[in-house]
């Protein structure tokens, strides 16, 4: 019985040592990858932040170009309206009234 108990103790000790060394190796590899900047979540977050900044940068450019195109079209359409609309009634409707505001006079 003494031999069986010592074999069981040896197997248990070997198993504990193997598990402990595997855990130590995992911790060491993770710490070295964190220092090298290759840790999975760090790289993923960095890529996401770069992607966000590029998206906002490109989106801002698109908004600016769309607005400039809109202004060009608006200018052209207003010139075209001035040329085609020769009626005085249309101009009177578009004119801004000057003087005191009639809503304030009660």
From Swiss-Prot:
One of its GO terms (cellular component) is apoplast. Glycans are attached at residues 47, 100. The modification Hydroxyproline is found at residues 97, 100. InterPro entries: CLE_plant. Residues 72-106 are annotated as: Disordered. The keyword Secreted applies. Keywords: Developmental protein, Differentiation, Glycoprotein, Hydroxylation, Secreted, Signal. It comes from the Eukaryota. The keyword Signal applies. Residues 1-31 form the signal peptide. This is CLAVATA3/ESR (CLE)-related protein 21. The gene is CLE21.
């Amino acid at each position: 019985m003494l031999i069986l108990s010592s074999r069981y103790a040896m197997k248990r000790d070997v198993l504990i040592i193997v598990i402990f060394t595997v855990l130590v190796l995992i911790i060491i590899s993770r710490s070295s990858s964190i220092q090298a900047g290759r840790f999975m979540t760090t790289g993923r977050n960095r890529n996401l932040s770069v992607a966000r900044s590029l998206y906002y940068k490109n989106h801002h450019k698109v908004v600016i170009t769309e607005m400039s195109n809109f202004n060009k079209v608006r200018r052209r359409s207003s010139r075209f309206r001035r040329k085609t609309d020769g009626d005085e009634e249309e101009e009177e409707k578009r004119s801004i009234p000057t003087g005191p505001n009639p809503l304030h006079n009660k």
